[in-house]
Amino acid sequence: DGTRIAIGEETALGSQNVKINARGSGQVRIFDYSESGWVQVGSNIDGEGAGDLFGWPVSLSSDGTRLVVGADDNDDKATNAGHVRVYDYTASGWSQICSDIDGEAEADKSGFSASLAGDGTRIAIGAKYNDDGGNNSGHVRVYEASSCSQVGADLDGATADDNFGYSVSFSDDGSILAVGSPNFDGNGSNAGRVYIYEFSNGSWSQVGSGIDGGTAGDTFGQAVSINSAGDRVAVGAPGNGAGHV
């Protein structure tokens, strides 16, 4: 009835502007709920450098033992290319399990969105300003979480300024992926669109037609969430005159 929420065993909280390593480096903390309330699990996880905004997106596996964190303004590959890190929780605490997943090019902001499949096997990473399909068309890449190796080809935005990858959401087993493209112009300027993809036979294929925003300016797809089975999706359209989902 909407009065109770299950978050697995842990909740991850991101703090973009924390100044532990440098101003705006960011930080993530993880908490367990017990009879005494919310208790931190493991140490703080700090961003790498000034302005990284580490902790902008965070995503936990269903059992709370695997964590994905984005830092969309990280500069390791190029200025504001962004990166994502993957952590596992063991008796010794939170440990990074594979190399950083860096954005492709300057100003891509890879890691602006990130979704970890509920079973912890795959990660979807959005880079809303990537230019592969046109200036700021955006793209999404999917990775095996345990190895940080890419799964299938890039998923690119259709046209310039679509901001494809602004939001991403995985089904529980990582086989079905929802991607928001809030500035797509199908039903008017910035009406928005959401795409659904399924992984089969080594590649990603679109499922049905895109789901379009109703009117110009809706920015339909700024937020997207797909259920564990991958057969129902909720989409936010904050630019709609009434504001709707």
For the regions a protein language model found, what residue spans apply to each?
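Conserved beta-strand/short-helix segments
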Residues: 1-245
